[in-house]
Amino acid sequence: MRIAIAGTVIGTTVGITVGRTVRWWRTWGYDPGEAAKALPGDDLVPTPKGIITRGITIDAPPEAVWPWLVQMGYGRAGWYSYDRMDMQGGSAKTIVPGWQTLAIGDVMPVSPDGGFVVKVVEPGRALVLFTDTEVVESQAARAFEPSSDIPAGLAASGTILRQIPEDFAASWAFALEPLDGGRTRLIERFRIRVGSAGATFRVVGPFIGFGVFVMMQRQMVGLRARAVLTAVAPPVPAPIVTESHRPKSNGRAIEPAAQTVVVAG
């Protein structure tokens, strides 16, 4: 009897947990209108077998969000997600001027061996990344090479990369839509096409889809936190001094240092 009761309690708990997880997966950030609308980069994967579209409202204008998008990538500012999975260190908490240049054809790295190819760059509006079988295969072999620079999660992904079918393509779009009150709606869309998938890929496919959502959700929350704080941080007022009282070094007046905004946490 005790075993039966314990089993019932465990089963009920697991069922509730799974139910809540599935509901979170299906509803977080989901808007039917956004899911149906066309976004930049949709044409890169015209016949997807899977689409994930999620949105989040940010209390900051698009120009405050854009710099955080441009500097993303492994070895750069990171992905603002679960860093132990996709970064060697933590994601940046400041806007880095040296990572603010991004052009079509550049690679936004996901590991030391490569990453997504940049396909669309519309400053303040849209960023679209892309990969396909050709890109993945050129990096898959290197993913197996042991390296202290590759987190365990990335190294383990080499097995999955080897199972990518021939007809594979994926696009990852970030769209910024201005809202009233100086706010922004960030919409992310991940589209994937998988051809004649092998047995391994068919098994892990659903888990990959859930994994993409989990990382995306954390990333969007991280982007929101960073953009909001940098947008509302008040400027540091420069001291009012006369020329005769301005601090000097070697006879030259010292100008006030520029402000650096740091995200707490």
Residue spans of the language-model regions?
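A short, structured loop/turn motif at beta-sheet edges
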Residues: 59-63, 118-126, 175-185, 224-231
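Short, surface-exposed coil-to-beta transition loops
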Residues: 51-53, 112-114, 167-173
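Mid-length scaffold segments of soluble, non-membrane domains
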Residues: 87, 94-97, 107-131, 136-140
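Beta-strand/loop substructures that line and gate deep hydrophobic ligand-binding cavities in soluble
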Residues: 34-35, 138-217, 223-225
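Hydrophobic ligand-binding cavity/cleft-lining segments
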Residues: 10, 17-103, 107, 115, ...
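Surface loops and adjacent helix of pleckstrin homology
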Residues: 70, 132, 189
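Membrane-penetrating hydrophobic segments
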Residues: 1-6
